[in-house]
A protein has these predicted regions:
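Anionic-ligand binding region
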Residues: 143-147, 166-176, 180-211
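Glycine/small-residue-rich loop that forms an oxyanion/phosphate-binding "nest" at active or ligand-binding sites
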Residues: 68-114
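C-terminal edge-of-domain segments
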Residues: 211-220
């Protein structure tokens, strides 16, 4: 009889946000598939959990997913986790879940925090309709194509961005989407959690003087003002 894959949400910053059900699940499975085993080990140690782990990330290749699926088909249970938040969101976990569906492996969700939804709720922007766009490509051509494709969307746009790329991303957003209202959420649920609101041009000016720190979630309104120089 096949085992089961548990999709387990982990904290996006504050370890106290790990649910009791998630703690129970991580403690009972046969093994854990982790984006970065070093990050997950810190979480397990905090909750006094000892479990064997295998790494599963975007550079793992198809064989790692096949190996995990084979173990599940042999009757083992596995929890898939990402470094922070829900697996499968801007994360290769979706490929493992798809493979489990194809092979008839039972899947169970153990929901947890999501940086995108948390940031949207804190942004004060329209939450009735939104589009999660993940990380923009590092290639300028692909970034421009992505932004051009969504520039007329009538919904709030949500992006993830790393601190070292934030300035370039703000420049690209301004150039392609115009000078929209934006909310920058950083270090969500951590000590230095911050929400900064204004126009894209104001954010560009802000970070001429400041060095971006921490992981960012960007939320933009869908109505653009005329682009200003």
């Amino acid at each position: 009889m096949a085992g089961k894959l548990y999709i387990v949400g982990t904290p996006i910053g504050n370890l106290s946000d790990l649910s009791p059900r998630a703690v129970e699940t991580l403690g009972k499975v046969d093994f854990i598939a982790a984006e970065d085993t070093r990050v997950t080990q810190k979480l397990l140690t905090h909750f006094s959990i000892s479990k064997p782990m295998v790494s599963y990330h975007k550079f793992s290749g198809n064989k790692r997913g096949e190996d995990i699926t084979a173990r599940l088909l042999d009757g083992e249970t596995c929890a898939i986790v990402t470094d922070a938040g829900m697996p499968c969101i801007s994360d290769p976990g979706e490929e493992l879940v798809r493979e489990c569906h194809e092979h008839g492996v039972e899947i169970e969700s153990v929901p947890g925090p999501s940086a995108a939804i948390t940031a949207l709720c804190m942004s004060g922007l329209d939450t009735s309709r939104f589009s999660f766009e993940g990380f923009l490509s590092v290639t300028k051509k692909q970034r421009d194509e992505h932004l051009d494709e969504i520039k007329d969307f009538s919904r709030t746009l949500i992006f993830y961005e790393a601190p070292h790329k934030l300035k370039n991303t703000l420049d690209d957003l301004y150039r392609v989407l115009g000078n929209r209202q934006i909310a920058l959420c950083r270090e969500l649920t951590k000590i230095h959690e911050e929400v900064i609101k204004g126009t894209i041009s104001e954010m560009i000016e802000r970070y001429k003087e400041l060095t971006p720190r921490g992981e960012y979630v960007l939320s933009l309104i869908h109505i653009s003002e005329p682009t200003r120089p």
